[in-house]
């Protein structure tokens, strides 16, 4: 039986990695070994940052809500507690959008929170 050197499989594997590394800077898209390392790192970054993105957006929403709440004389935590007491179930994403797009509606929500806190 003839010896098989596996050049087809090797070329296919290398081609796949170099295709994934397309657009990387310098040797990271030219050389197989460095490209492979960078692709592995890219998978790690993608996995990590899909989770990080959720935390980052929540932080952004809280910062926006806090800024709008302070314009209405409340801190973020007092506003959230007041909304909970008033049985107003609006999530942070929607609250942040309301704070930016419709200041009057946010002010009305802040007033409701103040009333609930006063009781």
Swiss-Prot record:
Question: Which PROSITE patterns does the UniProt record give?
Answer: RIBOSOMAL_L20
User: PANTHER family from the entry?
Assistant: 39S RIBOSOMAL PROTEIN L20 (PTHR10986)
Q: Note the Gene3D superfamilies from the entry.
A: 6.10.160.10, Ribosomal protein L20 (1.10.1900.20)
Looking up NCBIfam families in the UniProt record yields:
rplT_bact
What does the UniProt function comment say about this protein?
Answer: Binds directly to 23S ribosomal RNA and is necessary for the in vitro assembly process of the 50S ribosomal subunit. It is not involved in the protein synthesizing functions of that subunit.
Q: Please state which protein family the record places this protein in.
A: Belongs to the bacterial ribosomal protein bL20 family.
By what name is this protein known? Large ribosomal subunit protein bL20
Q: Which InterPro entries match?
A: Ribosomal_bL20 (IPR005813), RIBOSOMAL_L20_CS (IPR049946), Ribosomal_protein_bL20_C (IPR035566)
Q: Which gene encodes it?
A: rplT
Q: Name one GO cellular component term.
A: ribonucleoprotein complex
Q: Which UniProt keywords apply?
A: Ribonucleoprotein, Ribosomal protein, RNA-binding, rRNA-binding
Q: Which residues form a coiled coil?
A: none
Q: Would you say which domain of life the source belongs to?
A: Bacteria
Q: Which GO terms describe its biological process?
A: ribosomal large subunit assembly; translation
Ribosomal protein listed as a keyword: yes
Q: Name one GO molecular function term.
A: structural constituent of ribosome
